[in-house]
Design a protein with these regions (language model features):
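Pseudouridine synthases involved in rRNA/tRNA modification
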Residues: 1-13, 19-25, 159-247
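Residue-level signal for inorganic ion chemistry
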Residues: 17-18, 64, 90, 132, ...
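Glycine- and acidic-residue-rich catalytic/RNA-contacting loop of pseudouridine synthases
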Residues: 22-37, 74, 92-142, 202, ...
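A short alpha->loop->secondary-structure connector
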Residues: 30-34, 79-86
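Glycine/acidic-rich beta-strand-loop module
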Residues: 46-81
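A short beta-turn/loop motif at secondary-structure boundaries
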Residues: 54-57, 136-138, 182
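Short beta-strand segments enriched for Tyr within beta-sheet-rich domains
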Residues: 75, 152-160
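A structural micro-motif recognizing beta-strand termini
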Residues: 93, 146-149
Length: 247
């Protein structure tokens, strides 16, 4: 019996709502990890499912697992080919003047004895791309929808701090770390097309620490939010805005 919230399940795939604080791999210094709990997720199948991608320890939300080696290979390929649709929600430690945009940065890994390792923008790094937009503002903080096209390590965290100019609330590496209960990032939804099968689709509910800060209880799906924004524009101006025409 598992206490994980199962968001999607079929013969080859499983999507769980990963809780914050749960590492994918067992940390060197020990502690809770998904790796230690994979047996709970067999759910009657012979093999333990294996994660097809990664989420940071603090990040909550949609995590896809494969139930057999062939499925894992196909899922890994789908992520590499960038055909997996991913939407994240993050709370910024401030409100940006610009409300939406596209961030394109090359990222590289550095390390030091004092600060450990981190990702930084660097010309010699690997390209990374994220579309973003503010969807709510509460008490001097912004709830932002992130749509990453690439999947670099710490991509959204670096893009918030260096691309938007405001780090995620609670981020100990790219922000001050003391402003929130954790790095406030949530993998809201995931969609993976499959040949000869229905797509894998899942949406994770808004976590309690997001709603405690005034964001929630659950956001509208991204498509509904976009339609709502267009409708508001028509009401206010008598026609669609220039930004909407570009979408």
């Amino acid at each position: 019996m598992s206490d994980f919230n199962i968001l999607f399940e079929d013969g080859e795939a499983l999507v769980i709502d990963k809780p914050t604080g749960l590492s994918i791999d067992t940390p060197r210094k020990g502690g809770p990890s998904l790796e230690k709990r994979l047996d709970e997720l067999r759910l009657g199948f012979q093999r333990q499912p294996q994660p097809a991608h990664r989420l940071d320890t603090d990040t909550s939300g949609c995590l896809l697992l494969a139930r057999n080696p062939k499925a894992l290979k196909r899922f890994n390929m789908a992520f590499e080919q960038r055909i997996v649709g991913k939407v994240y929600l993050g709370i910024l430690a401030g409100i940006p003047e610009v409300k939406e945009g596209r961030i394109e940065l090359s990222l590289s890994k550095i390390s030091s004895a004092e600060k450990g390792w981190r990702m930084i923008p660097a010309r010699a790094g690997k390209p990374s791309v994220t579309d973003w937009r503010v969807i709510a503002e509460v008490n001097g903080r912004a709830l932002v929808e992130f749509r990453p096209e690439t999947g670099r390590t710490h991509q959204i965290r670096v893009h918030a701090a260096s691309g938007i100019g405001i780090p995620l609330l609670g981020d100990p590496v790219y922000g001050d770390g003391a402003s929130g209960p954790r790095t406030m990032l949530h993998a809201l939804s995931l969609e993976m097309p499959r040949e000869n099968k229905a797509a894998i689709t899942a949406t994770a509910p808004m976590p309690a620490d997001f709603t405690a800060l005034g964001f929630g209880p659950a956001p509208l799906p991204a498509e509904a939010l976009a339609a709502e924004a267009r409708a508001d524009s028509v009401i206010q101006t008598g026609g669609p805005s220039a930004i909407d025409d570009q979408d």
